Amino acid sequence: MIAAIFLAILSAFIHAMGLLALLYWQTRQWPRIEADFRPRNNLPVLLIIFTAILSLHIAEMLLWAGFYSWQGALPHFETSFYYSASSFTTVGYGDIVLSRSWRLEGVTESLTGVLLLGWSAAYFFSVVSRLFEIRGDLWKRQAGQHSSAGFRAR
């Protein structure tokens, strides 16, 4: 169980460092997006963020799978990764189960997965919210420019 708690903390550390690096990259993209707000500018940013977050989750699942394989909890790495992905995402098909002595590690991975997936969802939501905010500001500016032509700005 101590190893599982260590893996949970390590997973959270990996996730935090990945999101901080992503945030650093992302904040450098905002001026360009704000200056020329178009879908062709937004889509690559969203896809890069999605891919980075997906990569973080895969790395965290690989960490847990490596632990299961290293400890002999599951027979093959492929099986370990499949079990890890199933537990991490809380799908839990049940076709592969850990032995009685490893059950708490599986539960800890599931709890870690729920928290990290939620953290990622919140991060992605904040990015999309910021894009909507930028779009709204742009529309307000455009409405203000056209108000002298008979349009009323809100």
Show which residues each predicted segment covers.
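Helix-boundary and loop/linker segments of multi-pass membrane transporters
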Residues: 36-43, 95-99
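Juxtamembrane inter-helical linkers in multi-pass membrane proteins
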Residues: 29-39, 84-88, 138-144
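Pore domain of cation channels
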Residues: 6-15, 79-136
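Interfacial helix-start motif at the membrane-water boundary
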Residues: 40-58
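Outer-pore turret/helix-boundary of cation channels
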Residues: 56-83
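Membrane-water interface of transmembrane alpha-helices
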Residues: 14-31
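Short, highly charged, low-complexity non-transmembrane loops/tails of multi-pass membrane proteins
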Residues: 133-154
